[in-house]
Amino acid sequence: MNIIEKNNIDKNHLKKNLLDLLKEQFNIRLQLSSGKLKKTHLVKKNKKDIARIKTVLNKRINHTL
């Protein structure tokens, strides 16, 4: 999902996605530290997805002020 599509999603759905990504990030970091993670690119991808969602949410907050 790109940034334009994320701009059109409602706030509650974005927050749910953010929570899911944060849980996934936790699991990825656990696997990475234990040496079981085979797909190391997921660390970077997950981090960027979290940043994109936070950016959209912050734009909405700042735009309403």
Swiss-Prot record:
The keyword Ribosomal protein applies. The keyword Nucleotidyltransferase does not apply. GO terms for cellular component: ribonucleoprotein complex; ribosome. Keywords: Ribonucleoprotein, Ribosomal protein. GO terms for biological process: translation. Pfam families: Ribosomal_L29. GO terms for molecular function: structural constituent of ribosome. HAMAP family: Ribosomal_uL29 (MF_00374). Belongs to the universal ribosomal protein uL29 family. This is Large ribosomal subunit protein uL29. It comes from Buchnera aphidicola subsp. Cinara cedri (strain Cc). The gene is rpmC.
